[in-house]
Amino acid sequence: MLVPMVIEQTSRGERAYDIYSRLLRDNIIFLGTPIDDNVANLIIAQMLFLEAEDPEKDISLYINSPGGSITAGMAIYDTMQFIRPDVATICIGQCASMGATLLASGAPGKRYALPTSRILIHQPLMSGLSGQATDIDIHAREILRMREITNQLLAKHCNQRLEKVEKDVERDFIMNAQQAKEYGLVDDIIYKHK
């Protein structure tokens, strides 16, 4: 992946940053990939760094992600809830699956979607399991436990009844920005950067 560089003039000459480091200086974290352990570790490290720099300054987490690993996403979720700064979440493009859970878990009143955003919630996917029947049973029970946790989180952050969320995630439930606002996944739709 090609990462753009940004050149800035300083009193000591020119300084080159990769675009993500430059955004980090403005308390912006960009999640633009599927969520796996490596991506989660990078996002978490950035959040912890920004908290250490200024625990009172909001962090903006821009999300354009198809989702991914539940455990990696939950590590990001727990960090968002743990750190002192509010984490504002902004959906650009799409927030699907765990990406939608992270979008909904931003600070109350600071969860946004751009007008043409696509938000998808569904139950966790299970693929590629093989092995002994008892091992498959263990993994199946774990995926059901993770489904229960993510459903509870969506119900809490969207201010929905758990039964409604459980019904809605049985199949892919796709929303546009306005529908996501009505559902409680986001607080507002933003058209222009303020």
From Swiss-Prot:
Active site: 97 (nucleophile), 122
Pfam families in alphabetical order: CLP_protease
InterPro entries according to UniProt: ClpP (IPR001907), ClpP/crotonase-like_dom_sf (IPR029045), ClpP/TepA (IPR023562), ClpP_His_AS (IPR033135)
Keywords: Cytoplasm, Hydrolase, Protease, Serine protease
GO biological process: protein quality control for misfolded or incompletely synthesized proteins
EC number: 3.4.21.92
GO molecular function, one term: ATP-dependent peptidase activity
Metal-binding is among the record's keywords: no
Oligomer and partners: Fourteen ClpP subunits assemble into 2 heptameric rings which stack back to back to give a disk-like structure with a central cavity, resembling the structure of eukaryotic proteasomes.
Function statement: Cleaves peptides in various proteins in a process that requires ATP hydrolysis. Has a chymotrypsin-like activity. Plays a major role in the degradation of misfolded proteins.
Protein name: ATP-dependent Clp protease proteolytic subunit
Annotated organism of origin: Koribacter versatilis (strain Ellin345)
Protein encoded by which gene: clpP
